[in-house]
């Protein structure tokens, strides 16, 4: 099922974020990109599991709005997800130097919370 695939992919992004916490050779832009990607996939997984469609987008605010319209509220701990949208495209191709450094520990915590939230929103996996 697509929702489970998206969750698995979010977990893959989470591995990169976790490994980057202590590895300053990994650029902040890369860390931010994988935070954004994990959060995007989590939000899309929940939408997909509920039968809601979404267009191809990296805009976390748009996905947040779709979740809201579908009656799904992000937990307070995840409200800041939307600020990671620029990492999907803009910060991959623009000068990063004018932007504050990424709080990697906070980023890892946010991704873990997003994955835990998604796991709770998806129906139980059929182990048949």
Please describe what each predicted stretch is.
Residues 1-128:
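Terminal alpha-helical segments
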